[in-house]
Amino acid sequence: MKKTTLLAPVAAIALALTSLTGSFTSASAASTACTPSTLKTVTAKTLTIATGAPAYSPWVIDDKPESGKGFEAAVAYAVAKKLGYTNAQVKWIRTTFDSAIAPGPKKFDFNIQQYSITADRAKVVDFSSAYYKSNQAIVTYKGSKLDGVKSIADVKAANATIGAAVSSTSLDAVQNQLGVKPQVFNDNAAAVTALKNKQIDGLVVDLPTAFYLSAAEVPNGIIAGQFANVDKADKGAGLLLAKNSPITACVTKALDAVRSSGELATITSKWLTASAGAPVLK
């Protein structure tokens, strides 16, 4: 990713990270013996971590989580280190998004794949505390009706067609924050195709996805702007574990230590600093 100067948005991210301590877990408080020799992992003395197939930037760079490059890959290794695992003791596997969140036993110790923490999901899986809560952003292309907007009022005045995926926080944001009627798609892939074909003027997604789409997917793609995620029901993204996992409390304790030490903010700055380059729409 391009290096950018850390501006106010990054400071805001760091501040927000300090509040991401709530979690939906069913395990007891973490004991002091959260070590590779005592943790009841899928494979003894090995931490098996799952991600998507494929995994995309900026979450994982070049679809190689074992490199530790990318926001989620770096977070995973930071948690592993806090638990006492070396990189050699970390094993990566791949899962689909839906299969990992379904009820039942898991072949991984935790899965990191932008899983939003919700009460409904917590009925069938465990979550750690949150490691990230993203702003929303509008992806468009040069010369579109949304190119050059400076405010939410400008977005409304542009009379543009804005898309979002069904049942997403992005769709809620289009309706409730931008105050425009969205064009709804079955998934982000369909919406991206429509944007590429200029069937819509813009697409609302989370900020990291917006940077990837504008840089790698949408011809002449740009980010029209970002706006805060004000959905109080959005608890952020957490590490996903099997329901009643014996290591949920230890994983949460490790993630909380990564956050409180400032390391999570550093990782966020390294891999998501491009947020400083997207104008804030108010």
Placement of each model-derived feature along the sequence:
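Extracytoplasmic small-molecule ligand-binding "clamshell" domains
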Residues: 33-111
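Short helix-initiation/N-cap motifs at beta->coil->alpha
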Residues: 90-102, 183-197
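A ligand-binding cleft/hinge motif common to bilobed small-molecule-binding domains
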Residues: 99, 115-123, 173-175, 201-233
